[in-house]
């Protein structure tokens, strides 16, 4: 199976265009005001139109309420909901029934103990994203440039597709893929020159490095 590449936290037509032209399969838009990558609904509508038919549109939320989801779904028309908060299994099941969209749940990882809730989420989610656990004093759950010990996933037995994120860059994505055997990689801060400011060349370099890692993994 081909390695999926997701560029998350896109906010401008230029950087979205770079991701699409370089072949990203997924493009992520953040709907969380504390994040420097937050996009408003008007911008999301325009970016969604630009991405339509070229990549899967992913809406990232953090413990959002029903009204927020309704606005996002109506405006962006996402292909996938990415839940990055403390959403329960019951909440995820309700969202899937309500909107009829697949869900990717982010699991914050530091040690193998963080994998304990995975079984419940795997039953209801279409895809799992393993991300580095944020520090206790962090104001947002991801996009902080921190990695986690990828060997935590060594004994992983999961019947759902999964991706990895957290501190990925063009320099380490090959190692992440080699160790985790993930089906996809998700990057945000690793393709930025400042928080929330994506760099087109860094996006291209990351995708190029991910493709090289994919080729090595099938040899």
Swiss-Prot record:
A molecular function GO annotation: phosphoribosylanthranilate isomerase activity
GO BP field: L-tryptophan biosynthetic process
EC number: 5.3.1.24
Catalysed conversion reaction: N-(5-phospho-beta-D-ribosyl)anthranilate = 1-(2-carboxyphenylamino)-1-deoxy-D-ribulose 5-phosphate
Broadest EC class assigned to this enzyme: isomerase
Disulfide bond positions: none
Keyword match Isomerase: yes
Keywords for the protein's UniProt record, in alphabetical order: Amino-acid biosynthesis, Aromatic amino acid biosynthesis, Isomerase, Tryptophan biosynthesis
InterPro entries (UniProt xref): Aldolase_TIM, PRAI_dom, RibuloseP-bd_barrel, TrpF_fam
Family matches, as CDD domains: PRAI (cd00405)
Highest taxon of source: Bacteria
NCBIfam families assigned: PRK01222.1-1
Family from the record: Belongs to the TrpF family.
Name of protein: N-(5'-phosphoribosyl)anthranilate isomerase
Organism expressing this protein natively: Bradyrhizobium sp. (strain BTAi1 / ATCC BAA-1182)
């Amino acid at each position: 199976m081909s390695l999926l590449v997701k560029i998350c936290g896109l906010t401008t037509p230029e950087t979205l265009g770079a991701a699409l032209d370089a072949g990203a399969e997924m493009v992520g838009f953040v709907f969380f005001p504390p994040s420097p990558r937050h996009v408003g609904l008007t911008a999301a509508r325009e970016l969604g139109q630009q991405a339509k038919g070229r990549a899967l549109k992913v809406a990232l939320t953090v413990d959002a309420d029903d009204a927020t989801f309704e606005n996002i779904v109506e405006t962006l028309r996402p292909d996938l909901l990415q839940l990055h908060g403390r959403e329960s299994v019951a909440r995820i099941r309700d969202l899937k029934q309500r909107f009829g969209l697949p869900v990717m749940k982010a699991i914050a990882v530091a040690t193998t103990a963080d994998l304990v809730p995975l079984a419940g989420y795997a039953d209801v989610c279409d895809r799992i994203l393993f991300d580095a656990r944020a520090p206790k004093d962090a104001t947002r759950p991801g996009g902080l440039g921190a990695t986690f010990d990828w060997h935590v996933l060594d004994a992983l037995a999961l019947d759902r597709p999964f991706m990895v994120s957290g501190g990925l860059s063009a320099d380490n994505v090959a190692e992440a893929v080699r160790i985790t055997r993930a089906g996809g990689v998700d990057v945000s801060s690793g393709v930025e020159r400042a928080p929330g400011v994506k760099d087109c060349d860094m996006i291209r370099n990351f995708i190029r490095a991910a493709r090289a890692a994919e080729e090595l993994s099938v040899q």
